[in-house]
């Protein structure tokens, strides 16, 4: 990955609210299935904004920090996804998205961020991200002192 796109907590909340507004009316949804781990925080934000209390997870492992690897399903939510929103933080190459579509063919699959290779696999997303860009999510970063450039 050649570029980095840094996401702040404020940005994430703004994007999640935009997505939630597009998912109204909330009564059409039975619940949310958050893709662990990237979809957990966006899933909580959507649950809050839409007033949805039924939240489940599908646990899929496909990254080791910044390296993509083979997909492993560790835990899945029951059913075919009918009436459910499935949320992940982003769709990248589409590997996870294909697995989600296979597991939950009737779900409404959404992400906050989408790269070109994965865009056709989601029903909705908020922000376009170039394919060669790594996204730094706020839950992966800490706040630290940065000395002034002048050194004084």
UniProtKB/Swiss-Prot annotation:
Annotated guanine binding sites: 92, 135
Co-factor requirement: Mg(2+)
Top EC class, one word: transferase
Top-rank taxon: Bacteria
Pfam family, one: Pribosyltran
Substrates-to-products reaction catalysed: GMP + diphosphate = guanine + 5-phospho-alpha-D-ribose 1-diphosphate; XMP + diphosphate = xanthine + 5-phospho-alpha-D-ribose 1-diphosphate; IMP + diphosphate = hypoxanthine + 5-phospho-alpha-D-ribose 1-diphosphate
Function: Purine salvage pathway enzyme that catalyzes the transfer of the ribosyl-5-phosphate group from 5-phospho-alpha-D-ribose 1-diphosphate (PRPP) to the N9 position of the 6-oxopurines guanine and xanthine to form the corresponding ribonucleotides GMP (guanosine 5'-monophosphate) and XMP (xanthosine 5'-monophosphate), with the release of PPi. To a lesser extent, also acts on hypoxanthine.
Summary of subunit composition and partner proteins: Homotetramer.
Name of the protein described by the UniProt record: Xanthine-guanine phosphoribosyltransferase
């Amino acid at each position: 990955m050649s570029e980095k796109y840094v996401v702040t907590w404020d940005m994430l909340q703004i994007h999640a609210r935009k997505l939630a507004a597009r998912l109204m009316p909330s009564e059409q949804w039975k619940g949310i299935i958050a893709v662990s781990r990237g979809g957990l925080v966006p899933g909580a934000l959507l649950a809050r904004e839409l007033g949805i209390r039924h939240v489940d997870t599908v646990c899929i492992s496909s990254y080791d920090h910044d390296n993509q690897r083979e997909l492993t399903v560790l835990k899945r939510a029951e059913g075919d996804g009918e009436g459910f929103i499935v949320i992940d933080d982003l769709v990248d190459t589409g590997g996870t998205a294909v697995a989600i579509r296979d597991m939950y063919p009737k779900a409404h699959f959404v992400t906050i961020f989408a790269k070109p290779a994965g865009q056709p696999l989601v029903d909705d997303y908020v922000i376009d991200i170039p394919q060669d860009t790594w996204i730094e999510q706020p839950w992966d970063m800490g706040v630290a002192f940065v000395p002034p450039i002048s050194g004084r």
